[in-house]
Regions:
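Class I SAM-dependent methyltransferase SAM-binding "motif I" and its flanking Rossmann-like core
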Residues: 12-33
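Active-site rim beta-loop-alpha module in soluble metabolic enzymes
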Residues: 31-108
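His/Asp/Glu-rich mid-to-C-terminal helical/loop segments that flank catalytic regions of hydrolases
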Residues: 144-168
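Generic structural signal for well-ordered, non-membrane alpha-helical segments
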Residues: 55-63, 69, 116, 120, ...
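Fold-independent oxyanion-binding glycine-rich loops
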Residues: 12-13, 78-80, 118-120, 137-140
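Non-transmembrane, aqueous-exposed alpha-helical and coiled segments at domain scale
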Residues: 106, 112-113, 168
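Zn-dependent metallopeptidase/amidohydrolase metal-coordination segment
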Residues: 121-153
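Single conserved hydrophobic/aromatic residue that forms the stacking wall/gate
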Residues: 1-7, 11
């Protein structure tokens, strides 16, 4: 919902950018079964044109302190391309016009994808590879499917930042 905060609890971040694929130890910190299920569900098996998505678990202890009952929990897709990777059509059609519909309907062991943003999977993945704890909290400012947006989100973000800092 608009103005809600989305946290990934002990849930996951999914990177569409392929960033972690360039680092040693990637398979040790990623949820390979989730990745395989998602790629198969999306019909991307064998597609060498798409960066292999990776899935990172959030730090459970840190996220348990921050993501309380006032936050929506789920899987966040980090799609740095902003346009096509987030299902936005320009004057060029998407390679898979049902991409967002598939993403919305995807479920794996009770995990559902709740939102898109652009960099949290890289932050979570690199942190895990370096032995750090990290989590991110996103402010939902638009719902493209419902064609709703929160144009006055700046004040809400300040409140969310304060809430997260108090919970750390």
């Amino acid at each position: 919902p608009i103005k809600s905060s989305a946290a990934s609890d002990v849930y996951k971040r999914q990177g569409f950018d392929g960033l972690l694929n360039f680092y040693a130890g990637r398979n040790e910190v990623c949820d390979l079964d989730f990745e395989k299920a998602f790629i198969q569900y999306m019909g991307w098996t064998g597609n060498t044109c798409i960066a292999h998505p990776y899935v990172i678990d959030e730090d459970p202890e840190l996220t348990a302190r921050i993501a309380q009952t006032d936050m929506v929990k789920g899987v966040t897709i980090a799609a740095g391309g902003f346009f096509g990777p987030q299902g936005r059509e320009l004057r060029i059609p998407l390679a898979d016009p049902k991409q967002n519909e598939k993403i919305e309907n995807f479920e794996y062991k009770g995990y559902r994808i709740t939102n898109f943003e652009m960099e949290s999977s890289a932050l979570a993945g690199l942190s895990r590879l370096m032995g750090h704890k990290a989590t991110t909290v996103c402010m939902v400012i638009a719902n493209r499917l419902a064609k709703e947006a929160n144009s006055g989100y700046q004040n809400t973000i300040d409140t969310l930042i304060q809430k997260v800092l108090e919970r750390i």
